[in-house]
Amino acid sequence: MERCDAVICGAGIIGVSAAHFLAKAGIRRILLVDERPPLSFTSDRSTECYRNWWPDPAMLALINRSIDLMEGFADESGNVFRMNRRGYLYVTADERKVDEMKSASDSISRLGAGQLRVHTADASAYQPSRPEGFHNSPDGADLLLGSDLIRRHFPYLTDKAVAALHARRAGWLSAQQLGMYLLESGRRLGVRFEAGKVTGVDVEGGKVRGVRLSSGVRVEAPVFINAAGPFLREVGKLVGVNLPVHTELHLKAVVKDALGVVGRDAPLLIWNDAQTLPWADDERAALADDPETRWLTETFPPGVHTRPEGGGTDILMLWEYHTLPMDPLDAPPLDEQYPEIALRGLAAMLPHMKEYFGRMPRPQLDGGFYTKTRENRPLVGAMGVEGAFVAGAVSGYGIMSACAVGELLAAHVTGASLPGYAPAFALSRYDDPEYRQKLDTWGDSGQL
């Protein structure tokens, strides 16, 4: 019979990070089990971005810690995963939103995201972001007011923009390279990967005793970690725990921006206003006449966003305009209209996108699953059975949170001291009636 100190179900970015930090904490015989190759499925569908700009103090603290860890790994590795600090730029053309944007930014700044600096055209000490690397870059955020100032630094944006909030401790990286760095460092400390499926967890006397695999092998182990991503709930049932999570399909499109509409040194660009899509009059009339397409003429939510990708002309386009809960599938259904809808939505922020109308570049479309709790906080810690732990429900922030989630999970397993934010992510938070009552009026979850 095989013996391990810990078995981790799921080799996505969270499982790999958990393995890395458990190994660093001194646990040597760690088995990472997944039906699929490491860092595939949802981890391979990431936008690969990160930000510390969160309205939730616990989330902000978690992500700040995760960014600290990622920056340390970048320095150790010669920045093998190409972490940058270009930031997130939230843009609005609605004068009524400016005070709201400033007030919300003041609040996030006070929570620990860094100083908020407000700039006008008359007096601006705004420091543009560097395209590569992250050292010697400002944190906090810069609020640029007025079209002239905004377009001085971002000439590709619409002249209707009246405010642009540049969150600075933010950017993107290669999620695959970060994951492989964590996996390889873990392997050097005793982490082993096995392709297979966890089919059962043996619990005796209220304690985890072992794990059964689809190969028929039983692994004796006192610790079982559920890091199964979109299958978190299914795997939780193996120890008799019904985890309060659901999954949603989120899409992403990549196109060649041959016209250079998006600046190659741009930050992540986010349009913060609701809008109706720009159709020609005859197109709009035809769409409105058909009950199945009428929704394309109605109001779409804020949040369409894009960024340049790689050294060529690729751009990513994302917009969560129609998200529904869905059980995870290997080949999820993809909305073939999504790329054109996202491109048309981006034209509100990037007017030259209209030059692609009617001759859109061939898109690459894919989708991954967000696994979420109701309030969009992760689950990290004990799972209600001695020796069973969970690390997941990281929604759309898996890459940016992975390092801190792995570190926190390892602290729970080894009994190390826990950071102040740990209770906010423990499954036991739902045992508190006051916490459950807050869920009905939670407010901004920070989801982009």
Predicted stretch roles:
Residues 257-386:
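Active-site lid/adjacent beta-loop-alpha segment flanking the redox-cofactor pocket in flavoenzymes
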Residues 57, 61-64, 91-98, 165-184, ...:
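Short beta-strand to alpha-helix junction loop
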Residues 23-44:
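Glycine-rich FAD pyrophosphate-binding loop
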Residues 136-152, 324-325, 336-403, 407-413, ...:
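Flavin (FAD/FMN) cofactor-binding core of flavoprotein oxidoreductases
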Residues 1-14, 31:
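Beta1/beta-strand and adjacent pyrophosphate-binding region of the FAD-binding site
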